[in-house]
Amino acid sequence: MSQHVDIAAELDFALHLADLADAHTLSPFYRRDFSVDWKENKTEVTELDRATERLLADEIMRHREPHAIFGEEFGSAGASSAPLTWIIDPIDGTSNYTRGIPVWATLIALVNANDEPLVAVVSAPALHSRWWAGRGMGAFNARGKIQVSNVRALDEAQVSVTHHAAWDQVGGTQKLVELQQRAYRSRGFGDFWQHMLVAEGNIDAAVDAIGLEPYDTAAVCLVVREAGGTFTDRLGAASFRNGSAVTSNGHLHSDVLNIIRC
């Protein structure tokens, strides 16, 4: 269905949404002007998460009424049969946000009925950074078009790994350790940022947590792919809905998956 969508126009609209989100989230972050609650899954949420998602949803309904919405805080809105769905994470990295760490972003993606991401924006105003992509248009940041690295050997690669208890539960922790030992250098940049660093060619592969949701992955998936990289789940499937995310420059993807697969 993507041939019936004006991708450039929808990308412009997604960038407009990101502008709204940045204006809503950045000042309270610096002022530390928000309260923190806890969800049932023991993750933090602020009133800014909820208010930002509501702001973006209202703007989408105002200007893209036929489209559906799926967001972290309020779930689905609009017709389930809608040909296009906006997938939103108002603040990816809420834990960082609440602690004054500037590594957080608003993630916005538009996907079609075949679950193909068409446009994506990852906006991290506290990092003074934004990344965006349109299907078939490439991926960009403020400096221009971005592209993944050309590193082809794992022992020359910089990787980022996000570990938590779910990796223990599937017996994968030692595999992550092995990946880090075999890489030239390992860091833990976390959340969206590690994948954007892959897209920019600054690092060469990133392995995320297990238990991710589509609002964590839809936008980063398209940005990485349009930058020439590869996005899969931890088992190698291409869907962004499978609860995990591995990104790379493509050359290293099989090597990474062969080590961490469990």
Regions found by a protein language model. Give the residues of each.
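N-terminal subdomain of lithium-sensitive/metallo-dependent phosphomonoesterases centered on the IMPase/IPPase/PAP
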Residues: M1-I91, L252
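Small-residue (primarily alanine) positions within well-ordered alpha-helices
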Residues: A14, A18-A21, A120, V220, ...
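Residue-level signal for inorganic ion chemistry
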Residues: T25-P28, D49, I60, T94, ...
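Conserved residues at the C-terminal ends of beta-strands
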Residues: E72, S123, A209
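DPxDG-like acidic metal-binding loop motif
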Residues: S80-F140
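A structural micro-motif at secondary-structure boundaries
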Residues: N141-K145
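An extended, acidic
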Residues: Q147-C262
